[in-house]
């Protein structure tokens, strides 16, 4: 093995460490404001204080205490809405638990918002609608069976002569929730402004664990994913106002998003609130409502898992929230392959092993070429050493002589490295797919590995992986000097410590890959044997 091979391996380790912190370049938001028409309805020639026209149903304030909580239950979740701001206080996912221990609590999203500004609270921009306005719901609770659709309508009647209705439409089967916000102008003067929906969440991650390593705000704007950790807005507000498709608060596995419907998001402003929360203010396009008219703005909510098929079904490019990095074009097929094999074997660990075997077979020609090149280079070592001794005082002459030696023996000096480099994007893509796949969350493999998204609790697989790396090195023919040998002997130790805290699913991939490589190397050594 040559010095350049050692350098390639060492650089790969460095890139591997840094890669998990890279999420692709972020576009700078354009400063231009967005002006998009919204749906305006003519109430008719009724008196300014009335909403009796046929196009708008009469305002009937339900006989329920204002600001009361309303519970909505479907087969997927239990949501608690508040009359304060007609907001969503929390949503508990029935199919997901905080840990994989028996009796663990179900995952509850949005519950850590600022109590004064629950998620999806709505305020007026340009007119006096408070985010703490007390709305009256049309029902005290809702329960939906699979396939059913039902509505929750919150109504707020303002003393200044306008009415705001927020209508949530639920699907008993999915995670998506339709939202329509309507302003009815019963006053004698036009009302100009916009609606603004508020997301608030703790500025610091609720917990210091792997789930929150990508915690923060994200949005899809102008065809690009933009992610902002809380620290990005700790000292200054950040605003996006061009081509926004959706805006969200997310962590590694779950997403709470507001989706645009017919360009209904004009801008998103991120900041640290006065109360110390991460705040996302999502504004609609500006509107003007004449007396006797109404305006309705539509959005869609998604609060659920970052599972690629579920996200894709929502539309609006929501699947882009699953950020698989620079090599997502490779990582997404890897993820789909993982899901495909799982359907047949029922175990994600086995699915990882199958993918590893397929990749090893696919890259066999490149690996064969790499090892063959290294073997041929090894044969030239004595002649190269002689040339170095002969031209030790003339580096230019030595380099020319070495290149001539390569040409005479038809050896490519990069032949051992290039096949390795070609495989690096595939490894990083699979790394991303395994690291950020919710499918592996709490997925058992066998024996003591009960969660492929968590580290091996007894560190057995990382240690075995280190041993297989050592065996690999011993099987690789080399003409290294003493210093190079020490460097190479240190690599299994470095990798072992690196992988102690890595998800066991990723360690499993690397371990199986090493075992297959040992067998492959033994076979190739036999093929290229003198």
UniProtKB/Swiss-Prot annotation:
Entry-linked Gene3D superfamilies: 2.70.98.90
GO annotation terms (biological process): protein insertion into membrane; protein transport
Subcellular location: Cell inner membrane
Swiss-Prot/TrEMBL keywords: Cell inner membrane, Cell membrane, Chaperone, Membrane, Protein transport, Transmembrane, Transmembrane helix, Transport
Record flagged with keyword Transmembrane: yes
Membrane topology annotation: Multi-pass membrane protein
GO cellular component: plasma membrane
Self-association state and partner proteins as the record states: Interacts with the Sec translocase complex via SecD. Specifically interacts with transmembrane segments of nascent integral membrane proteins during membrane integration.
Function comment: Required for the insertion and/or proper folding and/or complex formation of integral membrane proteins into the membrane. Involved in integration of membrane proteins that insert both dependently and independently of the Sec translocase complex, as well as at least some lipoproteins. Aids folding of multispanning membrane proteins.
Protein name as catalogued: Membrane protein insertase YidC
Protein source organism: Trichlorobacter lovleyi (strain ATCC BAA-1151 / DSM 17278 / SZ)
Name of the encoding gene: yidC
């Amino acid at each position: 093995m040559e010095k350049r091979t050692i350098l390639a391996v060492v650089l790969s380790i460095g890139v591997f460490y840094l890669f998990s912190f890279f999420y692709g370049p972020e576009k700078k938001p354009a400063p231009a404001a967005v002006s998009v028409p919204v749906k305006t309805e003519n109430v008719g020639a009724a008196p300014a204080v009335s909403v009796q026209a046929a196009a708008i149903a009469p305002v009937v304030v339900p006989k329920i205490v204002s600001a009361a909580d309303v519970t909505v239950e479907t087969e997927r979740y239990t949501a608690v809405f508040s009359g304060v701001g007609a907001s969503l206080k929390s949503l508990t996912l029935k199919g997901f638990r905080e840990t994989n221990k028996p009796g663990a609590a179900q995952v509850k999203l949005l519950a850590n918002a600022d109590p004064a500004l629950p998620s999806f609270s709505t305020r007026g921009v340009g007119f006096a609608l408070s985010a703490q306005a007390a709305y009256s719901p049309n029902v005290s609770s809702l329960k939906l069976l699979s396939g059913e659709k039902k509505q929750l309508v919150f109504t707020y009647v303002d003393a200044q002569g306008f009415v705001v209705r927020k209508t949530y439409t639920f699907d008993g089967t999915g995670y998506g929730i339709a939202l329509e916000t309507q302003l009815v102008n019963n006053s004698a003067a036009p009302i100009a402004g916009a609606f603004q929906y508020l997301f608030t969440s703790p500025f610091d991650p609720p917990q210091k664990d792997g789930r929150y390593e990508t915690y923060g705000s994200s949005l899809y704007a102008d065809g690009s994913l933009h992610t902002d950790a809380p620290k990005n807005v700790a000292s200054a507000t950040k605003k996006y106002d061009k081509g926004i498709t959706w805006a969200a608060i997310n962590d590694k596995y779950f997403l709470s998003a507001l989706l645009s419907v017919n360009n209904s998001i004009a801008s998103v402003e991120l900041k640290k609130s006065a109360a110390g929360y991460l705040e996302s203010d999502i504004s609609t396009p500006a509107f003007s409502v004449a007396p006797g008219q109404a305006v309705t703005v539509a959005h869609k909510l998604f609060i659920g898992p970052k599972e690629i098929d579920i996200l894709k079904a929502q539309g609006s490019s929501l699947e882009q929230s699953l950020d698989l990095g620079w090599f997502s074009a490779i990582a997404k097929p890897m993820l789909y392959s993982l899901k495909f094999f799982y359907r047949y074997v029922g175990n994600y660990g086995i699915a990882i092993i199958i993918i590893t075997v397929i990749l090893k077979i696919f890259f066999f020609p490149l690996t064969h070429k790499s090892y063959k090149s290294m073997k041929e280079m090894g044969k030239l070592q004595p002649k190269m050493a002689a040339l170095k001794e002969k031209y030790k005082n003339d580096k230019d002459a030595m380099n020319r002589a070495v290149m001539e030696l390569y040409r005479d023996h038809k050896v490519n000096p990069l032949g051992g490295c290039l096949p390795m480099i070609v495989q690096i994007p595939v490894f990083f893509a699979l790394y991303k797919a395994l690291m950020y796949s919710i499918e592996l969350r709490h997925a058992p493999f066998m024996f003591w590995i009960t969660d492929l998204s968590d580290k091996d609790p007894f560190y057995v697989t990382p240690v075995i992986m280190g041993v297989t790396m050592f065996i690999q090195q011993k099987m690789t023919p080399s003409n290294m000097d003493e210093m190079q040998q020490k460097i190479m002997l240190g690599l299994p130790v470095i990798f072992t410590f690196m992988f102690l805290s890595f998800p066991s699913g990723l360690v499993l991939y690397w371990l199986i890959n090493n075992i297959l490589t040992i067998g492959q190397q033994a076979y190739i050594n036999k093929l290229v044997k003198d």
